[in-house]
From Swiss-Prot:
SUPFAM superfamilies, A to Z: YhbC-like, C-terminal domain, YhbC-like, N-terminal domain
One GO term describing the cellular component: cytosol
Similarity comment: family membership: Belongs to the RimP family.
Superkingdom field: Bacteria
Entry protein name: Ribosome maturation factor RimP
Annotated source species: Bacillus pumilus (strain SAFR-032)
Gene it is expressed from: rimP
Location relative to the cell: Cytoplasm
Gene3D superfamilies: Ribosome maturation factor RimP, C-terminal domain (2.30.30.180), RimP-like superfamily, N-terminal (3.30.300.70)
Any one GO BP annotation for this protein: ribosomal small subunit assembly
Major site of localization recorded for this protein: cytoplasm
CDD domains (alphabetical): YlxS_C
Pfam families noted in UniProt: DUF150_C, RimP_N
Task performed by this protein: Required for maturation of 30S ribosomal subunits.
Keywords: Cytoplasm, Ribosome biogenesis
Length: 157
């Protein structure tokens, strides 16, 4: 059910975002405790502010009220993805080149399933992450299809 909701909401919100020159980062429909939350994460090259989130929230809320695709009561939240934005699409990886990232893989690569370091290259098929191991740097090549999830990672170095 929640996958269908995510797809329907993604299709509904895209024209709103196109009109405001914003990008859809992710949509989540999750139950936390007794409450359902519909979370829409938006961004742009310059970031997003509270006014843009409010515009998207109001426009999407109207569309959701008209179409009524969700049977449960829920809270709608529209926000930026934050500093540790998820990397969902290949274009997200391209934008993240030179930045610190955290990735988990479906299966071990060099005996590990979690990697944090600089995304030094991405050719659409292989993501290369330069990780620090004590005082050495090591390049890890991670096939795109083996990435379970990835996000930007804040570094305090």
């Amino acid at each position: 059910m929640s996958k269908k909701v995510v797809d329907v909401v993604s299709e509904m919100v895209q024209p709103i975002l196109d009109g405001l020159q914003l990008e859809l980062v992710d949509v989540e429909f999750v139950k936390e405790g007794q409450n359902w939350f519909l979370r829409v994460f938006i961004d742009s090259d310059k970031g997003v502010d509270i006014e843009e989130c409010a515009k998207v929230s109001e426009a999407l809320s109207e569309k959701l009220d008209e179409a009524d695709p969700i049977s449960q009561n829920y809270f709608l939240e529209v926000s930026s993805p934050g500093a540790e934005r998820p990397l969902k699409k290949k274009a997200d990886f391209e934008k993240a080149l030179g930045k610190n990232v955290f990735m988990k893989t479906y299966e071990p690569i060099d005996g590990e399933k979690a990697f944090e370091g600089e995304l030094t290259s991405f050719d659409g098929e292989i993501a290369t992450v330069t990780v620090k191991i004590k005082t050495r740097k090591k390049e890890i090549n991670i096939p795109y299809e083996k990435i379970a999830n990835a996000r930007l990672a804040v570094s305090f170095n």
